[in-house]
Amino acid sequence: MSDNKPSEGDNKLQLKAPRRIVLKKTVEGSSIKQNFAHGRSKSVAVEVRRKKTFLKPGSKEGGFLIDQEKPEEIEEKKEAPKSPKRGEERHILRPLTPEEIEAKQKELEAKRQAEEEAARQKAEQEAARQKQEAEAARRKAEQEAARQKQEAEAARRKAEEEAARAAAAAPAAPVAAPAEAAPAVPVAVAEPVVVAQPAPEAPAPVVEEEMVEAKPLPAAAPAAPSAPVRLLHQPVEEEPKRKLSKAQREEMARRKTEDLVSKRLNQLEELREQKRKEDARKEAEVALAKKEKPVVAATAAAAAEVVAGRTPREDSAGEPFSAGRRKNKKYQDNEDRLQQPRGKSRRRKPFKSEMQAPAPVYREVTIPETITVGELANRMAVKSSEVIKLLFAQGMLVTINQTLDQDTAVLVVEEMGHKPKSVSESAAIEAELDAGEDAAEDMETRPPVITVMGHVDHGKTSLLDAIRSTDVTSREHGGITQHIGAYQVTLASGDKITFLDTPGHSAFTAMRARGAQVTDIVVLVVAADDGVMPQTVEAINHAKSAKVPIVVAVNKIDKPGSNPDRVMQQLSDHGLVPEAWGGDTIFVHVSAKSGEGISTLEEMLLLQAEMLNLQSNPTKKRARGTIIEANLDRGRGAVATCLVQNGTLRVGDICVVGNEWCRVRALNDDRGNQVSEASPSMPVEIIGLSGVPQAGDDLVAVNDERRAREIAQFRQQKDKEAIQAKQQPATRLEDMFEHIEQGEVEELNVVLKADVQGSVEAVAEALRKIKHEQIEVRVIHTGVGGINESDVMLAVASGAITVGFNVRADAKARDLAKREQIDLRFYNVIYDLVDDISLALEGRLAPTVREKVLGHAQVREVFRITKIGNVCGCLVTDGIIQRNGKLRILRQNVVVYEGPVSALKRFKDDVKEVREGFECGISIEKFNDVKVDDVLECYVEEQVKQTLS
């Protein structure tokens, strides 16, 4: 038999176990904590089944040794959930219900709010306590400083008195040895003034993260802390020993960090405030010490020892030096030096430079009469886009080259913040051309200028013919005056009178107004048979606006049916009361045909002129006059009729005439005779103009031809800019929307040429007055003289008609117009011109559609016919029903359908119409919902030609 002792490598079960058997619980009950992503957690009961194990003393349990000194680690390791081993039962964890989740969230939120409120209240209490302590320390320091100040003042006075007594009692010492006499003089030195500083709180243990400014100020004397030591890091209460989720741990850490940061910031702010107060107190004490330095009258020895109120052993603040004092001062100096930056800049105060935006520059912007958008922007030193944006915001669409008037430019400059300065170069030129006042000794009597005004066909020109013994009326087209005529008449007495004959037609309003402005007396001609007419009233208004006296000539008194008294009554209603009725208006009854009353009229005119005392300076004044009429003559060029008003106009003079200039080549009087000079109130015809001036322009003589050219060119440029601004105004958004809603208005373009400038103005104004809501006349070009090839080319490009008034077209213009099929119209009377243009406009108007009701029929019966529909059996109640008409179905006076008649029959025959009282059958196209007692209204649509009136 073998030995019963087993070998070391034998693994067979023996009766005696090598280790002792320990019976432990095979089933252990515990709980684990289940955490969810949303922050909730739940405890779950877990049972762990174990097998029997053999344990030796001191062996490890569960893979780790039990350490009694580290319960936290054991707790954490025990609480860590273990993954189930293979073969063990897996437990499924039940998730929380929505109600439980909501309740848990409310609980956590309430807890967080309670913690925040408690922390806030605690911080407020701490801040209030610190504030009270700081205030108490400040008051105590102020009281102590006041007490020490009083003691120092008393000691200083005492020292001064003792020094004065000692100086008076001691013998005078030699000046050469002041040092030997110094010890013999007992000098009382004032005790050092010790300023009590408020005892700061005990320095808290400063952590490494704190800033330099947070270190406490050094105490004046070592003293026990007056308050218990406060730690920056307060001990945090231990959390209950339970497993927290990751979100909860992060939230708690965040709150702790925020509390710590806010607490440190509060402490730092308190320390800074204390340091600021301490610095301010020290500065105040130093300033007070400098102000109160005593001036002691002592001997030379005392003066050597006492300098500026302190001993040589005192510092600048008046305090004695000591070892502790030197140490503290050195510590403070080093501390201040550390706070200063390194390098050379340590000697200077830190300076922080900041970039500052440049201040806006406001300018005085000079604005002429017209200016472009780009030029205005350059003068304001801004971008053109800014000006365009500003005008766009105001509703104006402009471009960089758009011309603005002065008022608009002023508004833009003010809106941009600049100061506008409006200048007028035209005003400067006018001031240059103005010669000033005339001396009284140079004035001489001049002939009166009399304008004859009145209604058309009342005999104005015939009256002038009777006075001049001429026959102008027979040479006028249509028997009416269409130009201003200027004549000078020499009476039998030798006196001279200048007459201006103005047109009476309504189209010549501008001519009449121009004649009233240059006249001295107005002769108002009224026909005794017609009485006061519209142009008569207009002439009265022109004369009143010009403040010119009126002499009424009642013409045609020899004509049957004349009633001068009615004329006087009508004129009285307009403010012209006759002298016979107690007024101040002169009435003269004349007859241009028989010559009756002509001499009386001349006498009244001379009397009125004498009362006006008309004078001028003919010798010592530059010539000045007004252009009455201007035209373009084929052989002589531009010709103008001028009425000289002051000075004397001579041949060879250089003149500025409106936008033109001239060197006078010839002067012709009213009868066509050449003269060498023209005196005041004399009408003459001037030859030698650079162009055709406008009627009403001023003529001024100048000394220099170059200056005359410059003025003329400047005026032409200004007129060109004004025309461009008028022709191309800034487009407004409101106007654009209005055109979009209403549609474009059709235009009739006209190129107008006339013999004289006054006729051009009159005809153009008459054409512009022809208006209609759908069409209007647009005069695109005007000129004086015959129609040439360029006028026809302009008409071709713009699709215009060419109108000539008292002029004709040359051969080239006629050939071009024939090839291009351009309509050329020629007129001598303004009536015919206006009538033809009106007819042309009416021809372009679209006809209007007018509805005409023919009759009514009542539905008596409705028949249903296959493949046709409903047929109405009707009775015509009034009018007729036509086959080609339209029907309107009325049901209780309400229109239910409109449409054409499909079929109209009487019995079985188709008929064209059915009259009143007869029955018929009517079929309506595309409508079958006809009921008994409906009324059928028959109507037709017809086109009617529109008229301008």
Swiss-Prot record:
Bias kind Low complexity: ranges: 165-183, 217-228
Keyword vocabulary terms for this entry: Cytoplasm, GTP-binding, Initiation factor, Nucleotide-binding, Protein biosynthesis
Region of interest (G1), residue spans: 454-461
Taxonomic superkingdom: Bacteria
Record carries keyword Lipid metabolism: no
Single Gene Ontology MF annotation: translation initiation factor activity
Region (G5): 591-593
Domain tr-type G: 445-619
Region ranges (Disordered): 54-183, 217-288, 305-357
Chief place of localization: cytoplasm
Disulfide-linked positions: none
Ranges where the record places region G2: 479-483
Keyword Nucleotide-binding: yes
Function: One of the essential components for the initiation of protein synthesis. Protects formylmethionyl-tRNA from spontaneous hydrolysis and promotes its binding to the 30S ribosomal subunits. Also involved in the hydrolysis of GTP during the formation of the 70S ribosomal complex.
Family per record: Belongs to the TRAFAC class translation factor GTPase superfamily. Classic translation factor GTPase family. IF-2 subfamily.
Identification of the protein by name: Translation initiation factor IF-2
Natural source organism: Magnetococcus marinus (strain ATCC BAA-1437 / JCM 17883 / MC-1)
